[in-house]
Regions:
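Conserved phosphate-coupling serine/threonine residues in phosphotransfer and NTP-handling enzymes
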Residues: 2
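Asp-based, Mg2+/Mn2+-dependent phosphohydrolase catalytic module
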Residues: 10-138
């Protein structure tokens, strides 16, 4: 899920050297994108909806993770009961992200730590008490 348009998301993935074919279904990039809805939490809903259509298994919100670098990214997951992993690669540091996320990483340079975090993260409803709009810029 990203606030970017589908086409921009694909360009960003390709520019990072990522083979986007692994994220495609029927030739179309799979997920939730900015051109799906203006309300960002609805993008998570859309990504989950698409996953349910593509995968024949019973999926729950805990089968997904929202990864982002702002409290508002975490909010998108939390309103959908999806755990959020915050990464301090943007304007928010570790301290600015720890209270609004279910897990926080400084960056993705330690692949083993990153994957272990993704595998173990659990949604914690306490984070819904966080004031996501306080001191947040888009």
């Amino acid at each position: 899920m990203t606030g970017n348009l589908r086409e921009c998301a694909e360009m960003k993935l390709k520019s990072a050297g990522i083979n986007t074919d692994i994220f495609k279904r029927n030739g179309i990039l799979f997920g939730g994108f900015g051109n799906d809805h203006i309300d960002r939490p609805k993008l998570v809903e859309k990504a989950i909806e698409r996953a349910h259509l593509e995968i024949d298994e019973k999926l729950t919100p805990s089968d997904f993770i929202v990864i982002g670098d702002t409290p508002k990214d975490m909010h998108c997951g939390h309103v959908n009961n999806v755990p959020g992993v915050a990464v301090a690669t943007g304007i928010f540091d570790l301290n600015g992200l720890k209270d609004c996320s279910d897990a926080v990483l400084e960056d993705f340079t330690d692949i083993e730590k990153t994957l272990a975090t993704f595998r173990s993260v659990q949604y914690v409803s306490r984070s819904l008490d966080y004031d996501y709009d306080k001191n947040v810029t888009e």
